[in-house]
Each structure stands twice: as C-alpha cells, then as structure tokens.
C-alpha cells in the first residue's frame, strides 16, 4: 500500500525535474507580450478661463518584448538575465473645462496618454515548484529612452439652448523626459509556466525608485508575455 502511495509522489517529482532543462544548460528565450501600467500620483490639471479641471491616471496597455538568457544552476533552480523593451505610462479620461448649464466657449481634451519608453535589464532567480512551474524574483534596472504626453485638444461652443458646436481637434505632443529620472529600479516578482519549449510568464515590478523628479510618482507595471526556449549550450 505504501508503495502505491509513494509512487505518484515520486512521479510528480520526476516530472518536476524533467520539465526543466538539465543542469548546466544555457537557454535563449525571445518573448513578446503586453504591459498594464500606471504612474501613481500623476494627476494632470488644466486651468482655462479660471476654471481648473483635473484627471487622475489610469492603467493602460503597452507593448513589451525582448529576450532572456537562462542558466540552469540546479535541477530546480535557474538564473536569468534579460534585455527588454517596455512601453509604459498611463492614460486619462476625456475632460473639458465646460461649466454645466452655462453657455460659452470651452476646451476639451481627449485621447490623453503618457507614453514612457524603457529598456529594462532584469536579473531573476527561478525556483521550480512543479512540472514547468516556476516562481521568479530578482532586481531590474530600467533606462528611460523617451517620454511624451499626447492628447487631442478641441475648442467647442455651448449655445444657450444646450446645443454644442465642435471645432476641429488638433493633436498635442509634449516632451516630458526632462521631468523624469532616466534610471529606474524595481523588484520583479512573477510566475512562469513552461510547456514543451513555450514559456508563459506573468510578473509585477515593485518600484524602488521615483519616476518623476519633483512629484515623486512611481511606475506600476504588470507584464504578461509568451516566449520560446532554445537550448543553445548543454
């Protein structure tokens, strides 16, 4: 009876080890994915005709991609180093300085988003807890390449009868890189699952440094990616 009890446990352990690369294997993992990012505390305010309006940041989606090298230290432990591109930032709801019930000329702001382009270098330790299933933690350095806030600005008139006449929207792009720190540090924590050579990864970057120089806001970012593992050295 004990033999039959321990046999499934032994089989699970063997599968957990065999799902990973052999000790001493160096693997190359190109990957693509999507970010869900935000910039905490980065409210935007517009003051037009003595009427101030503001908007709070919300999560937005962005592209993520790059590659990682992973070295299998032990049957259930690995170490990886990567270079990733990450489009982060935040978005805002559409706002205007219109006063309810009052006719006049106003300004509207739509499609507003902050785009921060980073190159990131994550160093991660992987602990395999099941067949192909790993928990990851480490340190990540980020370097800001470009930062812009973009939106469409539209003048419109509210008539006394409540009718609205819109003008032609025109795009606005503001360079915000000088107001941000060019270096960023974070602690990535995540989980990955490998099936065959396909690696699915989800992680969150806990910020260690401030994103902006004066406000003290921080980057908040979830990353979901899919990659393919090539064993290049055994």
Map each language-model feature to its residues.
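Bacterial Sec-dependent N-terminal signal peptides
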Residues: 1-31, 226-232
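Short glycine/proline- and aromatic-enriched beta-strand/turn motifs that initiate or cap beta-hairpins
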Residues: 20-70, 231
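Outer-membrane beta-barrel channels and translocator barrels
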Residues: 23, 74-76, 130, 195-198, ...
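Residues on the lipid-exposed face of transmembrane beta-strands in outer-membrane beta-barrel proteins
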Residues: 30-34, 63-71, 83-85, 121-129, ...
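Structural signature of outer-membrane beta-barrel domains
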Residues: 35-39, 86-90, 142-146, 205-209, ...
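Predominantly the C-terminal beta-signal and adjacent terminal strand-loop region
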Residues: 170-234
């Amino acid at each position: 009876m004990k033999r039959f009890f321990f046999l499934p446990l032994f089989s699970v352990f063997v599968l957990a080890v065999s799902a990973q690369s052999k000790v001493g294997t160096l693997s190359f993992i190109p990957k693509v994915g999507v970010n869900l990012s935000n910039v905490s505390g980065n409210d935007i305010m517009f003051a037009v005709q003595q009427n101030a309006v503001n908007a709070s940041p919300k999560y937005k989606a962005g592209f993520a991609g790059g590659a990682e090298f992973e070295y299998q230290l032990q049957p259930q432990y690995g170490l990886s180093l990567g270079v990733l591109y990450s489009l982060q930032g935040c978005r805002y709801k559409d706002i205007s300085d219109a006063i309810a019930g009052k006719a006049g000329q106003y300004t509207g702001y739509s499609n507003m988003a902050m785009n921060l382009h980073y190159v990131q270098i994550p160093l991660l330790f992987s602990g395999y807890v099941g067949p192909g299933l790993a928990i990851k933690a480490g340190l990540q350095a980020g370097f800001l390449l470009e930062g812009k806030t973009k939106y469409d600005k539209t003048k419109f008139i509210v008539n006394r009868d409540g009718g609205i006449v819109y003008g032609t929207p025109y795009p606005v792009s503001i360079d915000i890189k000088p107001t941000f720190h060019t270096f960023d540090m974070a602690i990535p924590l995540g989980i990955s699952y490998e099936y065959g050579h396909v690696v699915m990864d989800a992680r969150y970057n806990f910020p260690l440094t401030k994103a902006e120089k004066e406000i003290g806001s921080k980057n908040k970012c979830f990353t979901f990616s899919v990659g393919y593992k090539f064993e290049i050295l055994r």
